[in-house]
Structures are given as C-alpha cells and as structure tokens.
Amino acid sequence: MTRIILFLNECVPKMIATATILVIAILCLEWYRGWKNRQLKELKKGSRKKAHGIIFGKLGIKFVFSPWDKEGHVGIFAASGTGKTSACLIPTIRSISEKHVKSYTYAIDISGDISKNCPDVPYKLEYAPEKPDTPPYNIFAPIDALDEIEDKYEALEQLAFLLMPEKVNMNDNARFFLVNGRKILTASLIAFYPVGMDFISICERIVQSSWQELFRDIDNTGNIDAIRYINGFEGANEANTAGCKQSCDDALKLFATNGKIKRSIRRPKRGEKSVEPKMIEHSNIFVVIGEDKLSLYAPLMNILTSQLMEYVGTRKVTKNSPCILLCLDELASLHIDGELILDGVRRFRKRKCRLILLMQNTADLNILYGADVTRAILANLKYKVLLGGTGLGEPESQKYFAELIGYKDSTKHSTSSNAKQTTHTESEAKEWVIEPAELDRQGKDTVILIAADEPDGYLKLKKNYYFKR
C-alpha cells in the first residue's frame, strides 16, 4: 500500500503536468486554426484606422471590408440617391489613398462628386471634357506605342469595333448597316492614321464627306490595306452604301461635331500631360461628366473605359505591379460592350484588377446585354451589395437577390377539427430568409452584403457615409 501511495505521489503530478501541457497545446492549435481561417477569409472587420480596400459598411463599431490586395469583383445595386458613391465608392477610394497602399483607381465620376470628396488622393489625374483646361485624352496613344505597322492596323480595326459595337437583339437589317459601316470606319482609320491625322480630324473628314468623296480620298492615299475594306462596296446598291456610311456617321457624330469633345481629345503637345490607358499604372484617374450629359457623352465614356479595360486585359503583371480598381458608376449608361465586361469579371483577377460595377438593378443589365450575358456577369461578381432606401424597385431583381440569400427551415402548424376530435399537425417547410419584396424595406441606412464566404451567405450592415466620420 505504501508503495502504491509513493508511486501515485510521484506519477500524478507528472500526469497532471502532461495533461495540462496537452490541453494548452490543443487550445493553441485551435486558436491558430481560427487565426489562420480569419487570415484566409477574404472579408475583414476592423477599426477605421485598419480598414483599407473596398469598404462595404459598418457592423457595430467595426468596418467590414475586402482588403485592396485581395480578389473578387463587386456589384452595387440601388436606386439613385441611396449612397452608392457616398457610402461605398468615396470611403473605398479614401481608404486606399490614406493607407498609402500600392493601388490606383479609375472612376467614372458623375457630376464630379467622387473627385471633389477625395481631395487627398495622390497622383490624381482628372479628365473633365467640359472644362477648358482639362488634360487631353489621347485615343491614339495605345496605337502610337506599337512598333509594327501591321500591329497598328490591327489596333485601328479593334478601335473601330469599340466605336461601333453590336447591340443585343439587333435585327439583320440593322446588323448589315452596322457591320458595313464599321468597314468604312476601319478603312478611314487605316488610310488617314499613317499620314499623321489625329482622331478628331479623321472623324471630321468622315462625317463631313459624302460616301463617294470619302471613298475617293481613301483611294487617293494608295493604302492597299485600307482600300480592301471598301472594295466590297463597288457595284453595290448606292442607297445601301449611303445607309452604311450613315451608320458610321452616327457613331462618330459626338467626336466630329461637339466642340468640347473635339478640344479635349487629341495627342498632347510637347511637355503636356495627357490621359491614356497606361497612366493607370501610376495615377488615380477620374473621368468627370455632368449628370445631364451622361446620355450625350455615352460614346465617349464607352471608348475611354473600353480602351482602359483592353489595356488591363493585356498588362504584364509582376509581384511589384500595382493593384487596379475600376469603378464604373451608372454602368447601364456607359454602353460598354457586354463581352468586354464579361471578359473583365472573368479574367482581371490574374491582372491584379478588381471591378466595382454600380447600377440600379439587374434589369438594366438584361436590357443592355441580354439574359445570358447578364447571368454570366452576375455569377462572376463575388460580392453583391444592396443599399436600403428606395432600393431595387424591380420584382425580378428582388427575387434574384432573395434567392441568393436563400431559405430557412421552418415548422408549420395546422389544426383541423370535426365533431369527434381536434387534430394538430406539424410539417417542415422552407421560407425566405428575406422575402423578395422586403429587400426594399430594410431601412434607408441598411446595407445587405451578399458574400458566399460568410456563414449565413450574407451580412446586414449599416451604411458608412464619408461625411459621417
């Protein structure tokens, strides 16, 4: 008995110590796993000082954000006046500039509110065609940078496609005039670019000439590559040829006739700063357009954004390359080619670029791009943000987002009775987490963030207005 007591006195402390160490090790391992999971998680929560990147809103006193160097494109859906820029874009751009991270922004800035309220953004380059002193936009810059003439001609043809993109549900008649009008534009660009004409001068030459005069001028350049594009019109119905030329004129009218646009689109003078796609590698670019000019300047917004997206899609990325944030406000009004947007949300992850697409609802995309392209674009948006207030205002959009948020299990109770007995029945059922119609009734300061990496699939936040610090 004495030996047993001595043995226990000797072993028990060691066993307790071993067990304690084992418990501590397990707790440390669990803590590490939790910490590692938090590090791997794309969405972060932090104080205002620590929050940087895409700021979605507030959860209590913390800010919910996706760090600037993480991946995932964002769609922000809400009616005008609900805070798409004041509660999302401006805090996001400010946070990136305040933290001095290696990231640059391209923003479509309706009415200049974004640029004006981000005064401390470094390396700011503002293109505002309505201002006489705006730096010019050089449409030909990407083409001038090419060495081989064959590459230049190919880029000029691509420019013609950007200027005259196909629309969804075009009938055969409209497509005929568009496609052949694009051939006239391509021929003109290839004919007149090598002789030193700038973009606006070429647009003026095209619009001011009849198709007969234009074809004669193209022939007189002796440029075989250009002439090939108009050879097919020889012997064609003259009314059809005139219709094709008119289609080309319609696409170029803004550039050939609007004095403000003509003044602001050109090659820079010696020593003059200009705006061009490659500037996004070291500049924050704001394209400022008055809200009342959005429809008028849509062709300009389209070509600027399309050229920038083409640049991003082909940029060579290294570990030292900056991240790029493309913020496209009022996307439906920009008339950017759907395939270009789809290519961006699919491939820009590899180019260290994130897209923030702002629109009123999914119906805008359906009208512009059709159902199939719209579904593909939405599927490639990692984060979808719904802002409370007047909300989506469209039943199909409400149903789409309610389905993403999902359903919850519930128990339904029913009672039936007759003369002899009363029966109580329970049955399992599913119901909406948030009813579709209720998405627009969440309160004007509410943000619903739909994110697959959240346990519930979504978060309900409060808006983070830049002016409420």
Regions found by a protein language model. Name each.
Residues 1-3, 449:
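Class I SAM-dependent DNA methyltransferase catalytic core
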Residues 3-53:
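Charged, amphipathic alpha-helical linker segments immediately N-terminal to NTP-binding catalytic cores
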Residues 4-11, 15, 146-149, 417-420, ...:
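Extended hydrophobic/Leu-rich segments
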Residues 9-11, 128, 361, 464:
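Low-complexity, intrinsically disordered/propeptide-like segments
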Residues 16, 133, 364-365:
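Short secondary-structure capping/turn micro-motifs that flank functional sites
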Residues 30-31, 36-44, 59, 65-353, ...:
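P-loop NTPase motor domains
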Residues 48, 55, 59-62, 390, ...:
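Compositionally biased, intrinsically disordered low-complexity regions
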Residues 345-347, 351-448:
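Conserved ATP-driven motor cores of ASCE-family P-loop NTPases powering translocation/secretion/packaging/pilus
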